């Protein structure tokens, strides 16, 4: 595992927790090609960066799909818990909204 990327075990734990779907829109994703989004961004490094509570499975990349939407609309993303403040070391305490399920979740590790 690099400083900014979770190991394969964590990646699969998050993918399975999210039922192989984009956490936001619900699109089914391939276990061989999916993206994880860091709720507290990688540029705000800390020891919990790659914990499951800081990660959600998303469709697209930084330039398309829900992953792009998160970064293009930060105000909405903070409100919906898709982004977490750089000063928050406990993303597990910040509810995250799933649009296709129409509800909030608290993610654990």
State where each predicted segment sits.
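Short connector loops at helix/strand junctions that flank enzyme active sites
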Residues: 17-19, 34, 50-54, 72
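Secreted/periplasmic proteins that engage bacterial cell-wall peptidoglycan
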Residues: 21-35
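Short Cys/His-centered divalent metal-binding micro-motifs
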Residues: 27-30, 43, 54-79
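Histidine-centered catalytic micro-motifs used for acid/base chemistry in nuclease
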Residues: 35-39, 57-58
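Short clusters of hydrophobic/aromatic residues that line enzyme substrate/ligand-binding pockets
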Residues: 36, 70, 96
